[in-house]
Every structure is written in structure tokens, then in C-alpha cells.
Amino acid sequence: MIRYIFIFSLFVAQLHGQTYKAVLYNGTGAGSQEKLLAMTLAGIVNRDSARLYLLNVYETWSYNQTDEKWRDIYRSYGNVQFDSVQIVSQLIDKFREYIQGGISYDPNRYYSNFSGQNFRWQAEQAAMIGGLCNRLPVTSAMATLYNLPLSDSVLITDSFNDDSPVWVTGKVDNPTHPWNNTSLNEEARYLTLLNWGVQNILPLCNPSKFYIREITDWTVSQKMFQVNLAGTDGLDLNSMSVSKADILENVLTYLNTKNSDRIFHIYGWIQPEPMTQWFAFFGSSFHETLLGNLSFHSSFQVEQQYFIPKSKVDPDTVEPDNKYYIIFLGSEGDAANWVVGFQSGAWFSADRGKVPVGWGWNLHLFDECPFLAKYYYDTGTQNDGFLSVTSPLGYAYPDLWSGAVLQNAIDTTKYLMNRFGVDNIYGYKHYAGAGMMTYRGKTISNSFNFQKYGQFQKAIDAKLTMLFDPQLPTQIPITGYQALMFNHTGDGSFYGTATNLTEMANRIITNIKKQTKPGFLIAGYQRFRQDNASISSADITMPRLIQVVNLIKADPIVGMDVEVVTPEMFSVLMRKKLGLLNTREDENIPVGFALHQNYPNPFNPETVIRYQLPVSSKVTLGIYDILGKEVTKLVDKEQEAGRYQVTFDASKLASGVYICRIIAGDFVKTIKMSLVK
């Protein structure tokens, strides 16, 4: 039996139904320099509380009403009262107490990695440096206009390693800097600055998070090291120049060293996309986050809770019938553009809930931004199935992680699955053109290492792993790799054409007829869009999906036996058919004692500690400082056999390493936890 112990953290204003006040900056019509300043400001002031919301500063490309919708939801659902501002000088004045001055840059320094991109490289680095010392990126003229003093050098305090403060440039545009050597071309100048940053700025930045591409408020708030590097092609790994790849590898190697026994996270985007596999070899997980306001979403605190989708299925209440069970899955679930962007607006369809759908989510982003999770869980219906894409830890490849980080990856994955009530996963690899290639000493493949992948899925207790892989049989259950897998490939169900709905329905009907009852079919892995969107050939809307379902059910041969289900129902029925599910899953007793690594770690200010008992025991769970002095006792009582979780709130403690120790009968274990403020 699973039991949860919570220490609740709740805004007093929300607890008593009072209004929560924040500032809204309306960036509609603002220039790129003003927007960069506003994003940097938001990143600085939103670190410990949600103070500044950005409207139309850096909105999701997938749904252009994302900022407006979340603004309205915060007003009605979060009881937020926004003080709206559109003039930058007024915005700065509202938060001047938080700002130490400016970091100057040359606004005429542009660079592009590929056709269609163009960014101010000095400005982005000024924003990153400014975020580390609470200063805003400005030109010399802006510094005068907004009364933001400049300094030749600024002192940066290391928030993560307790190292001595370091002086760095306060003027990125200083002509004496090597990256301002006018004899160099623009790329050489930018890469010179990045290489300087790797040596001087990276050690001062967040050792567990890294950002690639255009800088955002999230980058600043988390004090990440940032680079804006990409290849010229979306898929060709060799389109990334050697000099750029060298910089990335130097950063990844450093982060791997700092996180030798745990996963670190990369945010932003990478082109070519197969580099996400290369990143995984260094022990990372990736997250597409090309959008603003994550600093606000992550800092808007809600009651610490565990979530159960309304689509959750009690295995004891259902049995497979003489039917064909089919599912439609929403793609892009790992990407913030879909997680934050309301599934590209499809979440607001009046037809959502009329037919079962499997919505993909990034559980790591949910954990970082629990208000978002709470909204989706509260507004979901029984027909809104939830699954994790491509891993609960994000856009990740568990089969590529080394043994050193595996236990942490398993522990954090199980925590995320447990917190969000999601135990079905969709994974894929499909970006190595030749099927397999070697890139900088690492093997990039179109297929998983099924033995390693299956071992990981078993370790996290994934109930069903759906995947797209060219090497596995299609549309049949696979149990030969220690975990239940179900693949779909080569039948038009992966980003299949949805332009002609009759043709789409006929394609699915043809695939259904290949099944024997009770049969199971992934009918479509499609990109869902808002109802009135201008859609591409692989996109679908809820009204169009309903038309497809009606066409399938109208088929005179199989139509009457087709049932569209959620991933949760699909998983339970398949396991019932295979004899893999015979007892209540939530009554399983652990086979041994365990104290798992806390998550998140490092943390600020809360972290969750999980432990398990195979028999009833007297449990003492305490927190100690590095000298062994007890800080607090979280548990001190008899507990029955089961799995437990407790939240440790360190908001009143100083940054540093703390020890968690459990004593349960003869079982004693400790873990180290890092509080970083």
C-alpha cells in the first residue's frame, strides 16, 4: 500500500482566498532590446517568488495565445491581480530595488547559425552575465536612459559551489576584449567570447542546468550557462562545425564531471536534433523550451501534492472484451511548446473529452512548474489520457546513460511517475539517416539498445512502453526485453497523413483488420493543433479526429467492434490479456528496505525524500548538517510496510550540503542533499 506524507507549502494569499499581486509587462510592439531586458529582469525577480509575468515577449510558436491564456488562468484560477505596465522605464522602476545596474553590449553585433536566424550575440552574453549579478543587458544609451550604472568589472558570487567571488567584465562591448578584435569575422568573434565564457563564466553557473539557443527568463532565473549554437541542417550531425561542437563538448564534459552520479538537464533547442542522443552520453536529459515565462510558472507556488489523472483505470474493474482497442496519441509531449502551449491550443477545443486521446507530457517540466500541472489535471476529463514522452525526465534516452548516473535516473524517474500518476511511456529514436553512425566517438542509432532500455523500463516499473522503432515487430505486444513494449512502424501511424480524413480512416481500418480480437492498435501518433489552426499534413484537430473515429466505426466489417481508449485503458487491457496483471498494483509490498536519493537535488527550497519498508518498522528519518548536528526530524513513529514520501522544506536554512538519515529496525542509510539558494 502506498502512503504519502506531505509537508504542505502554500501561499498564504491562496490559502485564505486573498489576492496575489504581480506585475505584468505587456511587450506587444516592443523592440527586441527591450524584450531582452524584460526577460532578464523577470529571470532575476522571479527566482524566489512569481513577481513579473511577460505578455508577448517570447511566446510559443505553436500557439500564439499562450501568454494571454495563462494570464487569464492566473487571474481566475490562481487569484492573481496583475499591475500592467507597457513602458520599460516604469517596469524598471517597479523592481529597481532588485537591480544593481547594467551590463553593456554592442547592439550592432549579430550572428546567425543557419538561414532565418539572427541574434545579438553580445546582448545574450550580457544578459547571462547580468543574471549572475542582478544587472540588466543594455546599450550605453539605454544605461543612461534607464539610469542603470555601468562598471568596467562586476563581482559575481558563486551561488552553487561556495567558491570565492570572481570579477568579470561589466562591458561586453569593451573594444579591448579579444572578441572585439575587428580583424576577426563575426563567427570567430562570437566563438571567442563563448570560449572565454567556458573558462570564466561556466564555473559560476548552475552545475545541473545548461541552456542552448536564444536566452530566456528561465535561463536567467536558474543561472544557467548559455550558448546559441546550431548546425546548418536539422538532421545532419556534421552540419555542426567542429569549433562549435568543441565548445559544446567542453561544456558537457564539465557538467558531466560536476554531476558524475546524477542526471543534469539541458534546455532550449538543438539543431541538428540527433545531437540529443549525443548529449545523453554525458548523462543529460533534454527539454525544448523556446519560450518565455517559465521563471514565473516555476515560482508560482501551489500546495505540494501528488496528482492522479481522471483517466486512471482501476485494473479490477475492467476486462478485455472481444473488441479492437485503438488509441490516438498526441506528439510533442516532451516539448514545452506543447506542455506550456496547451497542446498547441487543442486543450481548449470544445470537442476535447468527446473521444479518448493520449496527451503526451514532460513530467520534469510539470515538476518544475506545478501550477501548470495542477491546471491540466483539474481540467482534464476521463477521456484525456496522460502519458510521458519520451521519458519522465524529458527528451531522453535511458539506454545511453552510463551506469554511474543510472540509479539517480531511476530514482528521479520513479518519483516523477509517482507524483504525476503516469506509468505509461512513449519513446522513439528516428533521426539517424543511415540507421547508425558515429559522432565524436559516440554511436547514434535509429533504434534503442532494447536490452538496456528494457532493463531501465523494468527498474522504473513502467507498465507499458509504446515506441516507434524500425527494428521491432509492429502493433503486437513485446515481452522479451524484461518490460512490456508495443511498437508501431511502417503502417502510416507515426505522423501519418491526415489531410484526407477518409483516407486516414481507411488506412486505420486496414490496420485494424490485421488484428485478432481482442486486438490492440496505435492508430495515430499525431500533432494536435487548435481547432482553427492552419494545419500541416500530419496535424489533426479534435473535430477532425471525431470525424475519423466516426468513419472507422461506420465500417461494416470491424466498425461495431472498435473501441477508442486512453493509454491507461490500453495498457491495463493489454496486460490483462497477457496475464501480466492479476492483482491490485497498489497493494504490492516492497521486497526490501530503501532510502532513495531526494528529488530534486540540488534543491531550493523543497525536496522530496522517498523510502520503503518491507515490514512494519519503527522509523526515524532526520536531517543533519555537514557537522552531524540534527536540523529537523521528519519522521519518528511506527509505520506499516509500504512506500512513503516526505517533503523537506529548507526555506529557513542556509545553502549547503545536508545529510538525510533513516533508521528502520536494523536498516540504516544516509544520503547527501545539496541546498542551493
Name each model feature, range by range.
Residues N250-D261, I266-Y267, I326, S331-K354, ...:
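Catalytic grooves of carbohydrate-active enzymes
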